[in-house]
Amino acid sequence: MELEQREGTMAAVGFEEFSAPPGSELALPPLFGGHILESELETEVEFVSGGLGDSGLRERDEEEEAARGRRRRQRELNRRKYQALGRRCREIEQVNERVLNRLHQVQRITRRLQQERRFLMRVLDSYGDDYRDSQFTIVLEDDGSQGTDVPTPGNVENEPPEKEGLSPPQRTTATLDPSSPAPGEGPSGRKRRRAPRAASSLTPELAPVQVGAEGWGQGVIKVEEDFGFEADEALDSSWVSRGPDKLLPYPTLASPPFD
């Protein structure tokens, strides 16, 4: 009786009740004890872990290392190139600064020469000199070459100051007396020429001692005229306001004896 009930119960149960719930897998036994699948997996693992896989990784590492080395060398070359360019730029800047300073110096010299030229032209015009129609001899001095005399006509527009500076000596050399030293003697000749004038200027002051009262009076008059004052001139108010205690006493000077 119980057996019949069990069979009826099993017949009432459908095939769907033995299916696995959704999201789960049936744990089926491997075919042939799993030997075929395990052998295939072991062969694949041996093939990947063999020499061919290691050589590919090694080659890839070597390529990456070579690429990194090339990049390092390129960066070093670029760095050296930029350093050389920076040094060259600094040298060019220094040269440009020196050239600019030289240009400013030349501009200052040119302006000064132009001022001197205009001044000489005004002076010569005031003297009535005909430097515009005269000829001048200019000595051109070059490095390593002798100077040559080139006569050129005077020109107001492009005549340098050196041409104008040579005109007065040429005009005055013919009027110099023979007793005066030559122009080429330099400042020493002018000093020797001043010595007699200094001695002659002292003779009127020394004349009273040798000549007498008349010479002494003339000497005193000359000194007073030179200094521009009179003996009876009144003192300033600042001197008069001082008391006798503030004035310094000076002894009276004795008159020189007359013969």
UniProtKB/Swiss-Prot annotation:
Subcellular locations according to the entry: Nucleus
Entry's Gene Ontology molecular function annotations: DNA binding; protein kinase binding; protein-containing complex binding
Reported function: Appears to promote apoptosis in a p53/TP53-independent manner. Putative regulatory component of the chromatin remodeling INO80 complex which is involved in transcriptional regulation, DNA replication and probably DNA repair.
Subunit text: Interacts with NOL3; translocates NOL3 into the nucleus and negatively regulated TFPT-induced cell death. Component of the chromatin remodeling INO80 complex; specifically part of a complex module associated with the N-terminus of INO80.
Region (Disordered): 51-72, 141-210, 240-259
Residue numbers bearing the Phosphoserine modification: S167, S180, S188, S255
Pfam families: INO80F
Highest taxon in the source lineage: Eukaryota
Modification type Phosphothreonine: residues: T172, T203
Tissue occurrence: Ubiquitously expressed. Abundant in the brain.
Keyword DNA repair: yes
Key words, A-Z: Apoptosis, DNA damage, DNA recombination, DNA repair, Isopeptide bond, Nucleus, Phosphoprotein, Transcription, Transcription regulation, Ubl conjugation
Bilayer-spanning residue ranges: none
Any one GO CC term of the record: nucleus
Protein name: TCF3 fusion partner homolog
GO BP of this protein: apoptotic process; apoptotic signaling pathway; chromatin remodeling; DNA recombination; DNA repair; male gonad development; positive regulation of apoptotic process; positive regulation of DNA repair
Cross-link Glycyl lysine isopeptide (Lys-Gly) (interchain with G-Cter in SUMO2) residue location(s): K222
Gene source species: Rattus norvegicus
